[in-house]
Regions:
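Early transmembrane hairpin of solute transport permeases
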Residues: 27-130
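A structural signal for small-residue-enriched, beta-sheet-centric alpha/beta enzyme cores
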Residues: 3, 17-21, 54-56, 141-147, ...
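Conserved phosphate/anionic-ligand binding catalytic regions in large, soluble enzymes, centered on
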Residues: 16-32, 268-285, 326-330
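Flexible, glycine/charged-enriched surface loops at secondary-structure junctions
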Residues: 40-47, 88-93, 115-116, 201-208, ...
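Glycine/charged-rich beta-loop-alpha catalytic/anionic-binding loops adjacent to active sites
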Residues: 6-15, 55-63, 261-272, 312-322, ...
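Acidic-glycine-rich active-site phosphate/pyrophosphate-binding loop
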Residues: 1-8, 43-56, 246-265, 297-315, ...
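Hydrophobic alpha-helical bundle architecture
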Residues: 34, 40, 290-303, 307, ...
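Signature of multi-pass transmembrane helix bundles
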Residues: 109-265, 429-442
């Protein structure tokens, strides 16, 4: 039963997506509204209103739209409403014809798509209202990127799950953050990945997909100048002798290149982690690159990638789907654990790596999804490799320092508190003054 729960969590929290997941979620919501409009006999929307939470707007406003030169949630909404099929979920924009994309762009340029801040308690909230021919389609996504809770046609609900909790309103295979937080611990993840998991026979297809699919977008990011071309330039620096090509730089290159391509809107899929493609790339590609550098066998690599992604999921379950802190710090912490395992570290050593990551990169701010996400990712991967190298020697940030506690679970809880309650000095001081010095069980 427990092993099945690990698989359920992986399948619930890891999924295929194209482009940034926030514009993808906007396009999905708009596709539901547009479909409702078409069922009323209207071929296409004439005007669109998007009401979204601050976090959604922050993450969607500068992200590239896959396969186009456009960026932002207004274009995502228009594309979704005019030609999106909700069945494709976060890949909805991948299946829209070019002529429909251009019609959507014309609608945006004509000022017919409005984006407003929704005054709601949820960090992840999207409402799209599409109008045309005297009819109205309306849809709402809430809490999770694909959790459609309301669809209306001319004011009549064809789907209404607003009063249901997240688990009940979504797919039956969805595991809620609360369920994940109560089930996953660093110890249980370690024991599962190193003692129970049979990576060559257990149904971890999503992990294999993450390795394969995210490797493709990483290679794509190296093939041309996407965005700031962080991965490509790191690779060039190695070729010029300005940097040493080693495990750390290869891991940085692999992750940053994938984010370069994704943020620029390359029409290439990723396997996301906890609703974020960049987090999926960051939790997967540094570990894959390290395994290739160390010439590690496939079963061990798959264990390490699973470990990394589950650690990221565990942190994110309390961190919040969307946050004021950068998700690369979360996924980078997972990567640090995966790399520590590849370097021969045990449970104590991965705990040290986690403490080192929290002591180092905590506080990196999320200021939206955009090209320089790749720069932040490269920084977090560099920190992950350093944390792993220190951790394998048993070196860790001490519980006298900052928000790091003696117990790794409490350190991660402190990390989550900063994400959910802000990063003010008063919050930080409160965490520093109220520590539990109970050591980890060995």
């Amino acid at each position: 039963m427990e092993q099945n729960m690990f698989i359920r969590i992986l399948n619930s929290e890891m999924e295929l997506a194209t482009g940034c997941t926030e514009p993808g979620a906007v396009a999905l919501t708009a596709a539901e509204a547009g479909q409702a409009l078409r069922k009323a006999g209207v071929d296409k929307a004439e005007e669109i209103a998007v009401n979204a939470s601050i976090n959604i707007i922050k993450n969607a406003m500068s992200a590239g739209i896959p396969g186009t030169d456009y960026e932002g949630m207004d274009y995502a909404a228009a594309i979704g409403a005019l030609g999106g099929d909700p069945v494709y979920l976060l890949e909805v924009m991948n299946h829209v014809p070019r002529e429909t994309v251009e019609a959507a762009a014309a609608l945006v340029k004509a000022g017919k798509v409005k984006v407003n801040v929704a005054q709601v308690p949820q960090k992840l909230y999207i409402e799209v209202i599409a109008k045309g021919g005297g009819h109205t389609g309306r849809a709402i996504v809430r809490d999770l990127h694909t959790n459609v809770v309301l669809v209306e046609q001319d004011g009549t609900a064809t789907l209404d799950k607003q009063d249901a909790d997240t688990a009940a309103s979504g797919d039956s295979d969805v595991v809620t953050p609360e369920q994940i937080a109560s089930f996953l611990t660093v110890r249980s993840i370690w024991d599962y990945c190193t003692k129970e998991l049979d990576p060559m026979h257990d149904p971890i297809d999503i992990i294999r997909s993450a390795v394969q699919v995210n490797s493709v977008i990483s290679d794509e990011g190296l093939s041309k100048e996407y965005g700031l071309a962080i991965g490509r330039n790191l690779d060039l620096n190695c070729r010029k002798g300005l940097m040493t090509r080693d495990l750390t730089t290869n891991s940085m290159i692999a992750a940053a290149a994938g984010a370069d391509a994704r943020m620029a809107g390359a029409p290439v899929s990723v396997v996301a982690n906890s609703g974020s493609g960049n987090q999926g790339i960051t939790a997967t590609m540094p570990v894959v690159a390290a395994a290739r550098w160390l010439d590690i066998d496939e079963p061990t690599m798959l264990r390490a990638v699973t470990l990394s992604n589950l650690i990221a999921i565990r942190i994110k379950s309390k961190f919040g789907r969307l946050s004021n802190l950068c998700g690369a710090t979360v996924a980078g912490t997972g990567a640090a654990c995966g790399i520590t395992y590849l370097l021969g570290g045990g449970y104590h050593e991965i705990c040290c790596a986690i403490q080192n990551m929290v002591g180092n990169v905590t506080g990196m701010v999320c200021d939206g999804a955009k090209a320089d996400c790749a720069l932040k990712i490269s920084t977090c991967v560099n920190a992950a490799c350093q944390a792993a190298a220190m951790g394998t020697r048993g070196v860790r940030v001490q519980s006298t320092d900052g928000i790091v506690e003696e117990n790794v679970e409490r350190t991660l809880d402190n990390f989550a508190i900063l994400s959910t309650h802000g990063t003010s000095d008063s919050v930080i001081l409160d965490l520093m003054l109220n520590k539990d010095h109970t050591p980890d069980a060995q």
